[in-house]
Amino acid sequence: MDPHQSPADNAASPTKSVKATTKNSSTNNNVNSNNSNNNSNHDILNFNDNYTTILQHLANDHPNILREKGGSQQQQHQQQQQQQQQQQQQQQQQSLDTLLHHYQSLLSKSDNAIAFDDNVSNSADHNGSNSNNNNNNNDISSPGNLMGSCNQCRLKKTKCNYFPDLGNCLECETSRTKCTFSIAPNYLKRTSSGANNNMPTSSNSKRMKNFEDYSNRLPSSMLYRHQQQQQQQQQQQRIQYPRSSFFVGPASVFDLNLTKHVRLDNVDQIQLSKTLSLRKVSPTAQFILQDDFDTTLHSKQEYEVDLVENLVHPHGHLLVEIFFKLIHPFLPILHERVFLEKYSRSYRELTAPLLASIYSLALQYWDFHPALLGFPKPDVTAQLNNIALETFYARVGRPKLSIIQTGLLILQCRSECHNNWVLCSSVVALAEELGLGVECNDWKLPKWEKDLRKRLAWAVWLMDKWCALNEGRQSHLILGRNWMIKLLNFDDFPLNSPTILNSLQNDQSGSSPSSSNDVKNHQIAFGNLPIFNINPTLEDFKNGTLMFQQMVSLSIILGEIMDTFYTQGSMTINKSIEQVLKLAKPLQLKLREWYHSLPKNLSMSYATPQKLNSNSTLTLAYFATEITLHRKIICALNPQTPKELVQVCRTAARTRLVAAIEFIRDLKNEHINAFWYNCSTGNLMLIGTFAALLYVTSATKEEAMIFRDYVRNYTWVLKIGSKYFDKLSNALNNMHLLFAQIPGLLTDEPVVVSPNSNINSVNPQRSGVQSQIPIQFNVGSPAMTEQGSPLNQWKNLPQEILQQLNSFPNGTTSTTTPVNPTSRQTQLESQGSPAINSANNNSNNTPLPFAPNKSSKKTSQSSPNVTPSHMSRHPPSNTSSPRVNSSTNVNSNTQMNASPLTSINETRQESGDAADEKTAGRERTANEESSTELKDDNPNSNQETSATGNQTIKMNDDKNVTINTRETPL
């Protein structure tokens, strides 16, 4: 079919009826041809078709309309006309509708009608008139010819070239808009200013008079039906139905080499069928566009979005404001200006799942908006989530960017659910359908759409990686294979947020309902109730977009860790500890580089009282990534692993665990009530899982009890915080399901060391948990023989000697180990740990307390260090703990700047627990002796320390393993 041919040309029913009628009355037409000169309506009848026969059939239904004086002649033909009426009743009805349609379009065709009126000869050939009529029928079939130029072309004053098969003119198709027709332009021209146009011609007046007379004689039902059809057509023209897009891959049947030989239109598009078109956006990328939206789906969509709006009415606009202030800066996946423009016109221009997910996320901050303090929070979050999920799956078959935005927001709403993998996979599949994994810089798209596609692509990547980690699945996206997007930069984000900018302007004028003055007034009215300032600045908006960039960068490192160690193939290959350490080393360096490159405004120390701070969600993600890497290292240890290597690996793992637990303990209200990514609950569970893993892999009972205390204190932190933080509550409940099944972990059952964990593990220092064994110690001490750790020898000492050792003051014991100056300098230069920095933030809020260990008295004989100092219920102190030996005591600056990437050499003092102080002497003495034994002063030792700080360990099979103790145990 010719692409420029109207679909109405193929609709044969109206045309056939007219032709059939023409054959039956051809004799009458020839007879009346001589009288056509005297017919005042001759120009009208010849304009579109031979309407004389149609009028005759119309007269059959209404004989009074065209009644003449020759009544006897009418009676002769009455029986014949009645028979024709019964046979062609349906065809006549269609002809009447066509006649009405043609008469209505006469006004827009007046210019052509005038030409016909002036040039048509009285002796015109009948065949020639029929050919003109057929051409006019083709022109009338398209809306562009019915109404003239479309609104867009009329405003631009350009020629409107309408293509019926495309449904658009050339200008509208280029600008990707829908042709709309409101008022006939030719009629506007006639009524516009001008002397000639203001004076009606005789032919125009005749046409108008005949049209009015004829329309007055028509039945009222026909006019009503025609008016109703006209209103429906105008309503459909106003609605711009979006088309679904499908990216055409290189292996598709629509091969690029074939489409190169296809003739495209001016917008690089070809119409494949009535509902399908192929569009090339670049020499190497093309899409299939499908018209799969109709009035039925539109009506259903309006019903669904009305249902969503009624659940939160009349507070929908405030929830949208909350979303773009507190959530969207950290998840910038919407085009804010376009969204607000549509929402300001009507919420019906948005889809139900998108609006429901936005309302659901904003309801979390209902109590923080001053304008909503006097209203009860609607209990509709579950309803909104269900509507969003159901309507989302109903639209999966029609891929659009808005569907991906909806899926990402639903994943954020379902952050506490543990079965999001199917939903996440659907979002990834939709991203592949739209080609988000392909670089679009050279595509023929506007810049705002390119930027939006890049942000959406990396948001899908982020969701896929963290969901795969938390649910133990294989990630679908592989960087460099099916994901070829460049990293985000500052130019890919909007310069500002219209919502935040408008709020700041209202604050300056004092007209905002949530201005700072109102916040102060509410704070005075409610006493000491903490009222947070939810009005972010433009700097906060930039920090939010910067956090999104850093989260994407961290997820790339996480993706490498998952692909290296947690795929089915890698788990069967990378089993030996040597191979694992070799592969883990570059990943550890990338993590360190990422942490050191964090700007100050994303650190835990960057906080303002009574202002929400979301930096904690980024720090938690960093700890989860570190733990994910060290989980593999711990699982790779086996009984054949050298003792020194086991000691280094487990010490590094213990360091990460302690830092993560302290980080959660020191969270403040500004962090808890701020935005958290959907992976945060799973990351909280990873910390507890890692502690339990170290517990079950402990080689000795004493070490197992230490990690058991870590697990118990961490669960106590979650229990205290769960009263006002749902993520802590959900993490605690999910952890308890498994931990309760492990003997001795949460109960006072005897600790049983698993026979499979027959690892020559180092016995952890019996001082406070903060006094870690530094990574800079000299490993491979000859005292660590097959007979076990020298700490076991202290059990045979008399009780009197132990009491005398307890009386020694801290730091006076002679058995000290000097710290390597090079290693100490490296420590001083290292960046502070996020956990340590979080403990020293300047804030008025009290950190979460730790619970006292209820089983400390029962197990004090077998494990002196039951309640570590860092787990104390009291606030941490900056003074050195008496439990820490002098070999691990570094100055206070070193303690405050120790990075979790090297070691945590923190020392804190308990300030109110006399029972724990009684056991401090025994622990201190054991630690001092352990430090002395770990020190290697024997030049004949089987280890070598290079000038750069690298230590080479000679293994049993004469293989050397080099460990860089200046940087990391890896």
Curated annotation (Swiss-Prot):
Q: Name one Pfam family in it.
A: Fungal_trans
Instruction: Check the record and name the PANTHER family matching this protein.
Output: GLUCOSE TRANSPORT TRANSCRIPTION REGULATOR RGT1-RELATED-RELATED, TRANSCRIPTIONAL ACTIVATOR PROTEIN DAL81
Span list, region Disordered? 1-44, 64-95, 118-140, 807-970
Bias class Basic and acidic residues marks the residues at 907-938
| Protein name as catalogued | Transcriptional activator protein DAL81
PTM annotation (Phosphoserine): residues: 833
Gene Ontology cellular component list: nucleus
The record's misc note reads: Present with 704 molecules/cell in log phase SD medium.
Q: Does the keyword Transit peptide apply?
A: no
Q: Which residues bind DNA?
A: 150-179
Q: Which organism is it from?
A: Saccharomyces cerevisiae (strain ATCC 204508 / S288c) (Baker's yeast)
